[in-house]
C-alpha cells in the first residue's frame, strides 16, 4: 500500500466512487487541478488513485483535504479513474465540484467517513 493511503476502500465502494465521477456534472482532473479545488474549498469529494508513481505527486492531498474538511477516498487504479473522468489517459486524482445527484453523493461520503475511523 502506498505511503499516502490512510485507509482501505472496499471494491464495492470503489465502484460507487468511479460511478460518481462518471455521473458528476463538473470535475477537476489531475493533482494540480485537484489541489487548487481543495485549496479554494470548492471540492465536494476527492478521489485519489492508489497506484500513482512517484507517490509525491499526490501524497499531500489527504493532508490538505483533512485540513480543509473535504472528504476523500481511494481507488485502486489511476487508469480506471481516468476512464471514469472521461479521459483516455490515467488520472492521479479527481475532485467532484458539482455532483449532479447530491443525495447519492452524500450517502457515498458517509460511507467513506465510516471507513476513515
Swiss-Prot record:
GO terms for molecular function: box C/D sno(s)RNA binding; ribonuclease P activity; rRNA binding; structural constituent of ribosome. One of its GO terms (cellular component) is ribosome. Keywords: Cytoplasm, Ribonucleoprotein, Ribosomal protein, RNA-binding, rRNA-binding, tRNA processing. One of its GO terms (biological process) is box C/D snoRNP assembly. Disulfide bonds: none annotated. It holds the Pfam family Ribosomal_L7Ae. The keyword tRNA processing applies. PROSITE patterns: RIBOSOMAL_L7AE. HAMAP family: Ribosomal_eL8 (MF_00326). This is Large ribosomal subunit protein eL8. It comes from Methanocaldococcus jannaschii (strain ATCC 43067 / DSM 2661 / JAL-1 / JCM 10045 / NBRC 100440) (Methanococcus jannaschii). The gene is rpl7ae.
Amino acid at each position: 500500500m502506498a505511503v499516502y493511503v490512510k485507509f482501505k476502500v472496499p471494491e464495492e465502494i470503489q465502484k460507487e466512487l468511479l460511478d460518481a465521477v462518471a455521473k458528476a456534472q463538473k470535475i477537476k482532473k489531475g493533482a494540480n487541478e485537484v489541489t487548487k479545488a481543495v485549496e479554494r474549498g470548492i471540492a465536494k469529494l476527492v478521489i485519489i488513485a492508489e497506484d500513482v508513481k512517484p507517490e509525491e505527486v499526490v501524497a499531500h492531498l489527504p493532508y490538505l483535504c483533512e485540513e480543509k474538511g473535504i472528504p476523500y477516498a481511494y481507488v485502486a487504479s489511476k487508469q480506471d479513474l481516468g476512464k471514469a473522468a472521461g479521459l483516455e489517459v490515467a488520472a492521479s486524482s479527481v475532485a467532484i465540484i458539482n455532483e449532479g445527484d447530491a443525495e447519492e453523493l452524500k450517502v457515498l461520503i458517509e460511507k467513506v467517513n465510516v471507513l476513515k475511523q
